[in-house]
From Swiss-Prot:
Highest rank taxon of the organism: Eukaryota
Name of the coding gene: petL
Protein name: Cytochrome b6-f complex subunit 6
Organism from which the protein derives: Gnetum parvifolium (Small-leaved jointfir)
Subcellular localization(s) per the UniProt record: Plastid, Chloroplast thylakoid membrane
Main location: plastid
Subunit structure: The 4 large subunits of the cytochrome b6-f complex are cytochrome b6, subunit IV (17 kDa polypeptide, PetD), cytochrome f and the Rieske protein, while the 4 small subunits are PetG, PetL, PetM and PetN. The complex functions as a dimer.
Alphabetized InterPro entries for the sequence: Cyt_b6/f_cplx_su6
Family membership noted in the UniProt record: Belongs to the PetL family.
GO cellular component: chloroplast thylakoid membrane; cytochrome b6f complex
Amino acid sequence: MAILISYFCFLLIFFLFTLILFFGLNKIRLI
């Protein structure tokens, strides 16, 4: 159970990091 929760947290952090990186690259392109 604990492994599943930790894996889910890691996935959520990775998704958020990818989303921030994607928006950051788009902002750099627009400038």
